[in-house]
């Protein structure tokens, strides 16, 4: 009888856990849908900044001032700034593992070359995974708020811009998971600065933003010339001729600010969508596993009860025969 009690207790416990995982699955599905909507709403802004950047890069970089050229040139013998985006909470499968693994591999490679490293970590899980081994490299750590927060985006941007303007870093690379669907997240390493001239700066691949890596040349990419770019917004494809005039000493700096801002915003939204997709999938799998375990435990309970009843019947029959 004690065995039956243990089985009933375990079944009750698994059912309780199943309710929690099911609720978390539904919450993550709802959050993911909202974030996908935010991504869609931000497409126009990201596309506009992308087109302006393409137009700017049609000019000769050496026509710019020394202060402006630093956004397009690598500063030798300075630190590599790595921005790592992970989750604040767990229970999201391998979401953080792929990012942390890639960051560790890149840090090891940079160390072997004798290069300097700075880390900006966003998300508690990434900080916990990297602080023991690379605490001396960590420049800043930001906790990830429960909802998409522009203040976080601005703080990270200010850190990047300050480091670049003060010539503290040679380049800036961001690590995040790009959202493909609820079951698939693509680990992405994206160079933000210095901005590479000969790249396709199109960022949009509806319904989810697809940002071509600045600094990572894509097959078939061609130099941008004639100060022209292509706009593909809401199914419409047309050529836009930018009448770009270089005026104002802060023009390039302001555009770079917008560009870095859009890159971070894009990465944060993609990372959040990927996190909720990974968590939804993980909780769905946990719910299904709980259901399978409950079925096995119920079967075991029924067999145990049947064995007890059979034993009691045999004892009753044996007793009646003895009488």
Curated annotation (Swiss-Prot):
Q: Name one GO molecular function term.
A: proton-transporting ATP synthase activity, rotational mechanism
Highest taxon of the lineage: Bacteria
A GO cellular component annotation here is: plasma membrane
Recite the UniProt keywords alphabetically: ATP synthesis, Cell inner membrane, Cell membrane, CF(1), Hydrogen ion transport, Ion transport, Membrane, Transport
Question: Known Gene3D superfamilies for this protein?
Answer: 3.40.1380.10, ATP synthase, gamma subunit, helix hairpin domain
Q: How does it sit in the membrane?
A: Peripheral membrane protein
Tell me which Gene Ontology terms the entry assigns under biological process.
Answer: proton motive force-driven plasma membrane ATP synthesis
* SUPFAM superfamilies the record matches: ATP synthase (F1-ATPase), gamma subunit
| UniProt-annotated location(s) | Cell inner membrane
Q: By its UniProt entry, which Pfam families does this protein fall under? A: ATP-synt (PF00231)
Q: Tell me, in a sentence or two, what this protein's role is.
A: Produces ATP from ADP in the presence of a proton gradient across the membrane. The gamma chain is believed to be important in regulating ATPase activity and the flow of protons through the CF(0) complex.
Q: Which family does it belong to?
A: Belongs to the ATPase gamma chain family.
Assembly, per entry = F-type ATPases have 2 components, CF(1) - the catalytic core - and CF(0) - the membrane proton channel. CF(1) has five subunits: alpha(3), beta(3), gamma(1), delta(1), epsilon(1). CF(0) has three main subunits: a, b and c.
Q: Which PANTHER family does UniProt cross-reference here?
A: ATP SYNTHASE GAMMA CHAIN (PTHR11693), ATP SYNTHASE SUBUNIT GAMMA, MITOCHONDRIAL (PTHR11693:SF22)
Q: What is this protein called?
A: ATP synthase gamma chain
Species name = Rickettsia peacockii (strain Rustic)
Gene designation per UniProt: atpG
């Amino acid at each position: 009888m004690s065995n039956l009690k243990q089985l009933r207790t375990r079944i009750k416990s698994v059912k309780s856990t199943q309710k929690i995982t099911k609720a978390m699955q539904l919450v993550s599905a709802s959050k993911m849908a909202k974030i996908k909507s935010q991504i869609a709403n931000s497409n126009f802004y990201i596309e506009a900044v992308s087109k302006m950047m393409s137009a700017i890069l049609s000019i000769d970089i050496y026509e710019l001032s020394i202060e402006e050229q630093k956004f397009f040139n690598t500063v030798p013998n300075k630190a590599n700034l790595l921005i790592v985006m992970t989750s604040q909470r767990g229970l999201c499968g391998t979401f953080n593992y792929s990012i942390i693994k890639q960051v560790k591999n890149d840090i090891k490679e940079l160390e072997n070359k004798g290069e300097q490293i700075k880390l900006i970590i966003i998300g508690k899980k990434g900080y916990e995974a990297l602080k023991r081994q690379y605490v001396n490299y960590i420049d800043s750590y930001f906790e990830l708020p429960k909802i998409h927060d522009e203040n976080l985006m601005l703080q990270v941007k200010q850190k990047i811009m300050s480091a670049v303007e003060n010539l503290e870093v040679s380049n800036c690379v961001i690590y995040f998971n790009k959202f493909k669907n609820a079951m698939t997240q693509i680990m992405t390493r994206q160079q933000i600065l210095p901005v590479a001239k000969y790249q396709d700066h199109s960022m949009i691949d509806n319904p989810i933003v697809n940002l071509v890596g600045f600094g990572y040349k894509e097959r078939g990419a061609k130099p941008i010339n004639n100060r022209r770019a292509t706009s593909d917004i809401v199914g419409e494809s047309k050529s836009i001729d930018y009448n770009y005039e270089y005026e104002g000493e802060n023009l390039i700096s302001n555009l770079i600010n917008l560009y870095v801002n859009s890159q971070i915003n894009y990465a944060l939204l993609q990372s959040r969508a990927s996190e909720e997709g990974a968590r939804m999938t993980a909780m769905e799998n946990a719910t299904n596993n709980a259901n399978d375990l409950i079925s096995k435990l119920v079967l075991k309970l029924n067999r145990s009860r049947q064995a007890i009843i059979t034993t009691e019947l045999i004892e009753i029959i044996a007793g009646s025969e003895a009488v």
